[in-house]
Amino acid sequence: MDEGGMPLLPDSLVYQIFLSLGPADVLAAGLVCRQWQAVSRDEFLWREQFYRYYQVARDVPRHPAATSWYEEFRRLYDMVPCVEVQTLKEHTDQVLHLSFSHSGYQFASCSKDCTVKIWNNDLTISLLHSADMRPYNWSYTQFSQFNQDDSLLLASGVFLGPHNSSSGEIAVISLDSFALLSRVRNKPYDVFGCWLTETSLISGNLHRIGDVTSCSVLWLNNAFQDVESENVNVVKRLFKIQNLNASTIRTVMVADCSRFDSPDLLLDAGDQAGLPCRVFDLGGDTEEEATDPGLHTSGSGHVKEGLRRVFDSVLDGHGQLSDCALETKVAELLAQGHTKPPECPDADSRNKYLIFTTGCLTYSPHQIGIKQILPHQMTTAGPVLGEGRGSDAFFDALDHVIDVHGHIIGMGLSPDNRYLYVNSRAWPPGSVVADPMQPPPIAEEIDLLVFDLKTMREVKRALRAHRAYTPNDECFFIFLDVSRDFVASGAEDRHGYIWDRHYNICLAKLRHEDVVNSVAFSPQEQELLLTASDDATIKAWRSPRIVRVLQAPHPRPRPFFSWFASHRR
């Protein structure tokens, strides 16, 4: 090799040789001499290594926050939480859900063993508190969420009730004293519930109207139920929404519009022009949105005329409608004169979106409903329950509906609340739902879809690697989570998965012994991920970089400081 003089090989030839090597060999060769070291850090060399190693499409640009191709390669290789560092076995049954506090200092877990456990997130995770919900007639705990200042924990689960129903209940737990502050009925249980403000939460109730028609009512509840006056609300009705074809509202969550202005690091990958638009804006008045003009007119005269035409068609034998189809058609017509149109959005950045799964064709959740929550709706203050009900418009219309043409099994928001990630098991192309109680078969592959809540458009090609095997009637929720750069999800194939949000590539598979139900990134440290499984364990995963830092030997103190430390009181 060169000894400080002229190099024996020109840089261009060394570069061509390095192109044929793998990343590890390039780094090893860079230790030989200064010339090879310089070539081994060449930007064009690492650009080629990056696209080849990670198999990223060449038209996908580098992450906008990246400073070099070498550092970007290192980020995906060295900073993904894929090294198992701890296994928690305190639960005695399937672990269903995980949630972090906003500070990242604590997290909560829910399980089929009917406990909510709260953990200290130190370098070695330890159990802080366990709340047994069986004395409250719960079957199991399903979901939890910390409020914004991490002073309260919302926990929800299946409440057996007097008739062994599938209704649920929400409990609010103080994180200072671990006292149970309040309990709120929640039906169906997979509404889960969520925080709207630091001291108010959203729950649901379901009222049957017919065999396949119902009404979902979403309630705003005060976390503290003790009041000094009967004229002070502890609960207020937020929205009342009609359900057709055995569908119900489930999986509610809140997106904060004021956080949309955070730096946008998510760029569209490739040509998205060919993607079909899945978003239907129900708040607009364009002709394209009205699929059946007869069903979108208002006024009692139009409703009566529509009903007359439906019944005449049935009596004349022209319309071969099933009982379910007839009930749905009549319910749609009757609701037209009793539905409040969406309120015009304003420029107030304090507005929030209520997001939930729903449907219009079958009981299987195949649509995402979005309803704007205005500032005056974010408090229980106002008329006492029972007052102000004079209006005939007792249903609320949705602002937006996203149809995914498949069974939705999970949703999660990006840290800035702008992007909605959706786990969905697709229906066969061109499938038609003839019976609301018999939805189409669902795919074994899970598609991870991405929607921009600022533009209400699908912005990414579907991520696909994880799998599920249960049929429609046994399908259960797979919780996902999103960090600044990564998105993770569980799966029924005994693995958790991590993808890069920008490049749309799978970076890691995290093994369990059974179905992985939930994943959670630390909100303060995306190089820490938790996974929860039916194998009754919670596993903690850290990045190779963090593992090296934690395992590095600490330098021994110098003699003077050693003597000084030993003589301190």
Swiss-Prot record:
Pfam families from the UniProt entry: F-box-like, WD40
GO molecular function: protein kinase binding
Subcellular location: Cytoplasm
KW Transmembrane helix (keyword) present: no
PTM comment text: Phosphorylated at Ser-151 by PLK4 during the G1/S transition, leading to inhibit its ability to ubiquitinate SASS6. Ubiquitinated and degraded by the APC/C complex during mitosis and G1 phase.
Keyword terms, alphabetized: Cytoplasm, Phosphoprotein, Repeat, Ubl conjugation, Ubl conjugation pathway, WD repeat
Domain F-box: 3-49
Keyword Signal attached: no
Annotated disulfide bonds: none
GO cellular component: Cul4-RING E3 ubiquitin ligase complex; cytoplasm; SCF ubiquitin ligase complex
Segments carrying motif D-box: 308-316
Domain of life of the source: Eukaryota
WD-type repeats, residues: 90-129, 470-509, 511-551
Phosphoserine PTM sites in chain numbering: S151
Self-association state and partner proteins as the record states: Part of the SCF (SKP1-CUL1-F-box) E3 ubiquitin-protein ligase complex SCF(FBXW5) composed of CUL1, SKP1, RBX1 and FBXW5. Component of the DCX(FBXW5) E3 ubiquitin ligase complex, at least composed of (CUL4A or CUL4B), DDB1, FBXW5 and RBX1. Interacts with CDC20, EPS8, TSC1, TSC2 and SASS6. Interacts with TNFAIP8L1; TNFAIP8L1 competes with TSC2 to bind FBXW5 increasing TSC2 stability by preventing its ubiquitination.
Family statement: Belongs to the FBXW5 family.
Free-text comment about domains: The F-box domain mediates interaction with components of SCF (SKP1-CUL1-F-box protein) complexes, while WD repeats mediate interaction with components of DCX (DDB1-CUL4-X-box) complexes. The D-box (destruction box) mediate the interaction with APC proteins, and acts as a recognition signal for degradation via the ubiquitin-proteasome pathway.
Name under which the protein is recorded: F-box/WD repeat-containing protein 5
Origin species: Rattus norvegicus (Rat)
